[in-house]
């Protein structure tokens, strides 16, 4: 954003110690400051799990994803998680962890669909640093039934443009 103060009538300053108005007598030129736009990249982490999981195991890490913000610190208000497995009715007790700390509420992750985790202000990425989001759930269907031995499960995450905001710029990704 950009703003200018052109006349002394545009602002009023008060000295808090003396409780007196400060008179503006002369103008001074200033240089403009600019804030770069904000961008986000999400990649599967190199250490994201790919191994077998025991049937009915609890608190299984299904995937790890690296989030990187550039240009500005970035607030992410919602993350959408999804699972894919044939014949599976979703994952039971899904949850997201940001750098090892749970964010959002525990909820089932829909199969072939999307489940939105609302984060509010829990996820603010610092530009230029990597934040890791892990997806966990029980190795059961969303209905709590056992999975079939040998079944393959894929998980993913995504962020909608409308669910982001640059902390300083106010821009969306």
Regions found by a protein language model. Name each.
Residues 1-173:
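Exposed, polar/acidic Ser/Thr-rich sequence context and nearby capping/turn residues
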